[in-house]
Structure formats: C-alpha cells, structure tokens
C-alpha cells in the first residue's frame, strides 16, 4: 500500500490517493471524520482550527461502504480558502494584482522549511514553500491513517496513542491499561494524557507559552496490540518494520526523534536488563517476560505490543519572532508571523497514531495477501496457528 497527498494550506482542498487498499474493507466517511475531529482537538490549538470543520469526501475506490481494491481518493475542503481565492488561485494574475494580492513573504522563519525550500526550488516568494510544508497537510495523512485503522481493526489489531510530556511536564508511566482504556482516558483529556495529576500543569505550561508569544513541544507514544509474530523482515534493511516506523514518525512535521521500546534508555542498561526473555505455554504459545524491545526485534514483530515514541520540537512560528534575513534586501528583520498553535503535541499524537497505523497495516497486507480482506484474515489465522505450534 502507498499514498500520495496534494494541496496547499490555504488552497481549495487537500487530497490523498491511497493505492493497494484491499477489496472488501468496510469503510465509510464517518470512520474518517471521527479521526479528523480528533486531530482538531487539544489544548493549545490556534485559530485555524476554529475556522476549519474538516470533513472528508470519498470520491473513488469505495462503493456502498465497501472498498473495491482500486485507488481510493479522499478530499478535505479548506473552509478558509474563501479568504484566499486571489492569493492562492491557480490562474495567472497581472503585475499590479500580484503586488496587491500575493501577500509575498521574503522573510524566512527559523525552524521552518522556508529558506531551504526557497533555495531548493528557486522561489522568491516564500509563501510557495510554507503553503505546502505546513502541518495542514497532516489532515489527509490522518484520513489515510483512518483507513489503515479500519484494516487493523478487521485484522484484530488495536492501536492508541497518548502524550507523555509537554514543555518539560512529564506524565507518570501508568501500567496495565488496555488499548480501550487508553482511548477512553485520552479522549476525555484536553492534552491526551493518561496521568490526570499532571494534566492541569501541562495546560498551564501551554497557556504560559501562548501568553509570552512562545511555543512548547513534547513527547507522544503510540501502542498497538495484536500484531502476529514475524511481520517485517531481517533480510533487507528497507524491509525492517522498526525502520519503517521510525521513518514514519520522523516524517511528521516538527518531529525530531523516534524511539522504540525502551529506546535510548537501552544505552544506559546492561544487556541482561534490556533483552526480553522468551516464554512458551500451550495456551499462548511464544511470549516475552518483558517488552523492552517494544514488540520489535531484528526488524520483525515479536507478538508483544508495538511501542513507538516521537519527540516534537516547539512549533517554530512564534508571536515573538526570531531574527531572520530578508532574502530580497539581505537586511536583518524579525521573521514573518503566520497564524499558528502554541502547542500541537496532543494533535500530533493523533498524527503519530495515523502514520504508525499505516505502516502496520501496510506490513500486514504485504505479508499476508494484498487483494482482499477475507484472504488476509484467513492467512493471518493460519499463520498464528503455525507460530503457536512452532
């Protein structure tokens, strides 16, 4: 499976085309809209989320609530486009109109794609860069992730995400929660945090950053349960599932690090405390005493829960802008200000769920049969029986 997205932040719409989704998957707009709404929530979101009412339109690949096996096209309209029709229109405009309407940006913002992208593509107007590099694009990545979650659900895999840290405020590690319990708690938390004792402190940190014109980042964690043993591969570097998951996390806007299992903590512990001892019994088959590997060894699943974390840097669009240089005059200026969030960590956690879900669904479809859901389900059942008796 693969997908490609298109669209600008203030353009008419965002589009994603999904290829390789098996036939026979139950899919309706409500499944996707539920995830889009989750992305819009979270303490610290900016005014843009008050403007947009993200809903999906399925325009191909689905008939009467069932996928056909052909490419699926999803679109999400940008409600704010009505205020940008001249600025972001596709048709040529006159030189006079250009000066009046283009809202040309020549001051790159530190921490963004602005300067590097302008140099790479030769854009003298940085708006041509920021419109596409904006995190608004993650709207349709969440839509793609919603489809992946439907695949996982029908294949017996559950997934959930939560916030571990915001602006230096850390949540306690809460053990032995089911995926359903994680989902219920986070959906009722403004910061998607499991630890209610630090929830208000996280919100205060976000408010303090906003009031001072600053921004803060944090850490999110995604957990998936129900993956069969042996999904992925050790044979080639580009087929290792942990590599794909880390790459997916790092592809999210403003994410600067990824961990699987205990992650970097493994560097501080001896091997005897890091590696997960193997157990077997007639009822469960092969299991592990611990899950420090985060459900992945040698590029393959171990059958234990997948645990992936990502670190998001503070959003670089600040209301007290940092120093920059005008690319036309080369004079020092304060960077341009675009409407933005003070903290998007809770929403980014939803995006992280989506990209992890896509990689897991892709791995299952690739390994157990690509054409139709019924065949994939049968193959997984047979594989699980084989693995248990191995």
From Swiss-Prot:
Question: Could you say which residues bind NADP(+) here?
Answer: 39, 45
Instruction: List UniProt keywords, sorted A-Z.
Output: Amino-acid biosynthesis, Aromatic amino acid biosynthesis, FAD, Flavoprotein, FMN, Lyase, NADP
The cross-references to InterPro entries, in alphabetical order and at most eight, read: Chorismate_synth, Chorismate_synth_AroC_sf, Chorismate_synthase_CS
Looking at the record's lineage, which domain of life comes first?
A: Bacteria
A GO cellular component entry from the record:
cytosol
Q: Which cofactor does it need?
A: FMNH2
Matching NCBIfam families: aroC (TIGR00033), PRK05382.1 (NF003793), PRK12463.1 (NF009113)
Name of this chain's protein: Chorismate synthase 2
Which organism's genome codes for this protein?
Bacillus thuringiensis (strain Al Hakam)
Record lineage: Bacteria, Bacillati, Bacillota, Bacilli, Bacillales
């Amino acid at each position: 499976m693969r997908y490609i997205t298109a669209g600008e932040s203030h353009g008419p719409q965002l589009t994603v085309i999904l290829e390789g989704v098996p036939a026979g998957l139950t899919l309706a707009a409500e499944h996707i809209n539920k995830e889009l709404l989750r992305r819009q929530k979270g303490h610290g979101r900016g005014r843009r989320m008050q403007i947009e009412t993200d809903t999906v339109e399925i325009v191909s690949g689905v008939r009467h609530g069932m996928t056909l096996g052909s490419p699926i096209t999803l679109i999400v309209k940008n409600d704010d486009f009505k205020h940008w029709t001249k600025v972001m229109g596709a048709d040529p405009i006159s030189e006079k109109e250009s000066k009046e309407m283009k809202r040309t940006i020549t001051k790159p913002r530190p921490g963004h794609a602005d300067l590097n992208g302008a140099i790479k593509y030769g854009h003298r107007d940085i708006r041509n860069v920021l419109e596409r590099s904006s995190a608004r694009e993650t709207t349709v990545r969440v839509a793609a992730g919603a489809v992946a979650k439907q695949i996982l659900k029908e294949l017996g895999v559950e997934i959930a995400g939560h916030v571990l840290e915001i602006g230096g405020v850390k949540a306690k590690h809460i053990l032995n929660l089911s995926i359903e319990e994680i989902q219920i708690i986070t959906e009722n938390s403004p910061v998607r945090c499991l630890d209610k004792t630090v929830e208000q402190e996280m919100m205060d940190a976000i408010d303090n950053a906003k009031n001072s014109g600053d921004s803060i980042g944090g850490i999110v964690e995604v957990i998936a349960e129900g993956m069969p043993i042996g999904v992925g591969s050790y044979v080639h570097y580009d087929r290792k599932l942990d590599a794909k998951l880390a790459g997916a996390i790092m592809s999210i806007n403003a994410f600067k690090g990824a961990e699987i299992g205990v992650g970097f903590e493994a560097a501080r512990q001896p091997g005897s405390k890091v590696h997960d001892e193997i157990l077997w019994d007639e009822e469960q088959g092969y299991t592990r005493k611990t899950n420090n590997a985060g459900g992945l060894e040698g590029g393959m699943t171990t059958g234990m829960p997948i645990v992936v974390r990502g670190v998001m840097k503070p959003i670089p669009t600040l209301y007290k802008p940092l120093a920059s240089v005008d690319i036309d005059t080369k004079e020092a200026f304060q960077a341009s200000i675009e409407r933005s969030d003070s903290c998007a960590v809770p929403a980014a956690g939803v995006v992280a769920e989506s990209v992890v879900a896509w990689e897991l669904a892709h791995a299952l479809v690739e390994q157990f049969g690509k054409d139709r859901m019924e065949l994939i389900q049968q193959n997984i059942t047979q594989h699980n029986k084989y693995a248990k008796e191995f």
